């Protein structure tokens, strides 16, 4: 199976987990009203929102990767892996910071979020180069 077919499947199935996470978060917040502080609420929302938006945007990325570039299949595999790893790292970093971070201080979670952003940027630049080359 080609990367531009498999990776979108992974992204769509991942969106199902994000939807479930949203439902679970809403249930958690509703049932435990007042038990989450502003810090926890903000990072829950940020992680969840980044995951959903970036996964939807990854679907557009894979359309362009497959139809607007002449990259070899191996390059498509690498580009897709970089993108999805970045999406997971950026959104996951918010949840990690929620678990181990402190208000106003850096943590492994904030470093993971930044690393994810760099991976996503790398994948986007790679796609732009591929589009420009064709």
Describe each model-derived feature in a short phrase.
Residues 1-134:
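Polytopic transmembrane helical bundles with strong interfacial aromatic enrichment
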């Amino acid at each position: 199976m080609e990367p531009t077919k498999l990776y979108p499947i992974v992204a769509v199935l991942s969106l199902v987990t994000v939807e479930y996470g949203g439902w679970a978060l809403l249930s958690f917040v509703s049932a435990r009203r007042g038990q989450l502080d502003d810090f926890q609420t903000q990072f829950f929302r940020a992680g969840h929102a980044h995951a959903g938006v970036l996964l939807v945007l990854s679907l557009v990325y894979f359309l362009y990767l497959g139809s607007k570039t002449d990259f070899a299949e191996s390059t498509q595999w690498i580009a897709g892996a970089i993108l999805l790893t970045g999406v997971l790292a950026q959104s996951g970093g918010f949840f990690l910071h929620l678990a181990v971070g402190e208000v106003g201080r850096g943590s492994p979670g904030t470093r993971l979020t930044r690393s994810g952003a760099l991976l996503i940027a790398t994948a986007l630049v790679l796609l732009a180069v591929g589009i420009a080359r064709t």
